[in-house]
Amino acid sequence: MKNLVGRFMRYVTFDTQSKPKNHHCPSSTGQKVFAQALYEELLELGLSDVSLDDHGYVMAKLPSNVNYPVPAIGFIAHMDTSPDACGKHVKPQIVEDYQGGDIALGKGDEVLSPIQYPDLHLLHGYNLITTDGTTLLGADNKAGIAEIITAMEILLADPSIPHGDISIAFTPDEEIGRGANHFDVAKFAAQWAYTIDGGPIGELEYENFNAATATVVCHGVNVHPGTAKDKMVNAMHIAAQFILMMPENETPQHTEGYQGFYHLSGATMSVAKSELKYILRDFEAIGLQARQALMQAKVAELNQQLKKGRVEVSFEQSYSNMKEKVEPHPHIIELAKQAMVACDVEPKIKPIRGGTDGARLSFMGLPCPNIFTGGYNFHGIHEFITIEGMEAAVQVIVKLAEKTALHYRQ
């Protein structure tokens, strides 16, 4: 456990932001550099079958230390950080024994405030790792990587802890939805796995959104503005009309829990052509279909108003709710709950308002729920993590390996 914080602090200095416009895998050079460093670290640690493939996937195994059959289990985390905030020159700072109030982030005016982030009220006495206010932290998901490797280090050092075969993997490009694209499930050779990619202590998740991307294209007519009367059709105005037709109360800032949403995530605007990017999310497959149908209806309505087919919409499916693939295997969740309780961690089962590699892997034959890292406020400059949460995640991984082995001894 003594290497955990230092390991994490070292990992976050790697610039591993994924790049959605680059369709190579991995999408950024920094991920290749980080993958190589992890590969070398796992070799040095003494794990077996350590590999780094051409797509940047790092895998390794810890062989069983018991003399009876135990299903192989896996632990997975991702190497990339979100493109939503700067991930270069990350300078983490440790706040020891937090006692409340605003936390100054670096030398500027940026603060981490309990007024804006009430979770801080629950963390008095904890040791926090924050950003310096200029970048994200990268706890999502370098904390998961540090926790998995530290857990393997503990198991290697203490053969008295029984465990079956354990596979670990670190994936590229999860943040841009491609983390499972080249994942070799057969090579990984686990019966089930857990992503270590959740938030606060105790999170255990096996439900996630059904997800799709919608592209709305508005076609206009560009004419010199000096002679544009009755000729110009401004595609940006059409796009604005469409935006206002969408239900405002079903956007991310107005939804929570099991509520789905429409999220306008980007736009490219010009008079001649404007393009809107939406992400659609719903926990029910039929609900996602209904959201797509509503957008198609709004496009038809707007085209009728314009008296011409100037607007079109297309959809791309992203991932599905893993619930249907995990629920038939209740022992996967039960063992995780038992491991948490044994570590004095209260399991908090909740839906993931997003997706993980585990969602797609579950549909590739590898049921894969999600476990906490101890982090908060991912994807932005106010991201932070508690050292206690990281330590708890390590303890849960170790205990989960042990509980699985003991379960199959009976």
Curated annotation (Swiss-Prot):
<feature type="binding site">
    <location>
        <position position="379"/>
    </location>
    <ligand>
        <name>Zn(2+) 2</name>
    </ligand>
</feature>
<dbReference type="GO" id="GO:0008237">
    <property type="term" value="F:metallopeptidase activity"/>
</dbReference>
<dbReference type="GO" id="GO:0043171">
    <property type="term" value="P:peptide catabolic process"/>
</dbReference>
<dbReference type="InterPro" id="IPR010161">
    <property type="entry name" value="Peptidase_M20B"/>
</dbReference>
<feature type="binding site">
    <location>
        <position position="140"/>
    </location>
    <ligand>
        <name>Zn(2+) 1</name>
    </ligand>
</feature>
<keyword id="KW-0479">Metal-binding</keyword>
<dbReference type="InterPro" id="IPR001261">
    <property type="entry name" value="ArgE/DapE_CS"/>
</dbReference>
<dbReference type="Pfam" id="PF01546">
    <property type="entry name" value="Peptidase_M20"/>
</dbReference>
<dbReference type="InterPro" id="IPR036264">
    <property type="entry name" value="Bact_exopeptidase_dim_dom"/>
</dbReference>
<protein>
    <recommendedName>
        <fullName>Peptidase T</fullName>
        <ecNumber>3.4.11.4</ecNumber>
    </recommendedName>
</protein>
<feature type="binding site">
    <location>
        <position position="78"/>
    </location>
    <ligand>
        <name>Zn(2+) 1</name>
    </ligand>
</feature>
<keyword id="KW-0378">Hydrolase</keyword>
<keyword id="KW-0645">Protease</keyword>
<feature type="binding site">
    <location>
        <position position="140"/>
    </location>
    <ligand>
        <name>Zn(2+) 2</name>
    </ligand>
</feature>
<keyword id="KW-0031">Aminopeptidase</keyword>
<keyword id="KW-0482">Metalloprotease</keyword>
<dbReference type="InterPro" id="IPR011650">
    <property type="entry name" value="Peptidase_M20_dimer"/>
</dbReference>
<dbReference type="GO" id="GO:0006508">
    <property type="term" value="P:proteolysis"/>
</dbReference>
<dbReference type="GO" id="GO:0045148">
    <property type="term" value="F:tripeptide aminopeptidase activity"/>
</dbReference>
<dbReference type="InterPro" id="IPR002933">
    <property type="entry name" value="Peptidase_M20"/>
</dbReference>
<dbReference type="Pfam" id="PF07687">
    <property type="entry name" value="M20_dimer"/>
</dbReference>
<feature type="active site" description="Proton acceptor">
    <location>
        <position position="174"/>
    </location>
</feature>
<comment type="function">
    <text>Cleaves the N-terminal amino acid of tripeptides.</text>
</comment>
<feature type="binding site">
    <location>
        <position position="175"/>
    </location>
    <ligand>
        <name>Zn(2+) 2</name>
    </ligand>
</feature>
<keyword id="KW-0963">Cytoplasm</keyword>
<comment type="similarity">
    <text>Belongs to the peptidase M20B family.</text>
</comment>
<dbReference type="GO" id="GO:0008270">
    <property type="term" value="F:zinc ion binding"/>
</dbReference>
<dbReference type="GO" id="GO:0005829">
    <property type="term" value="C:cytosol"/>
</dbReference>
<keyword id="KW-0862">Zinc</keyword>
<feature type="active site">
    <location>
        <position position="80"/>
    </location>
</feature>
<feature type="binding site">
    <location>
        <position position="197"/>
    </location>
    <ligand>
        <name>Zn(2+) 1</name>
    </ligand>
</feature>
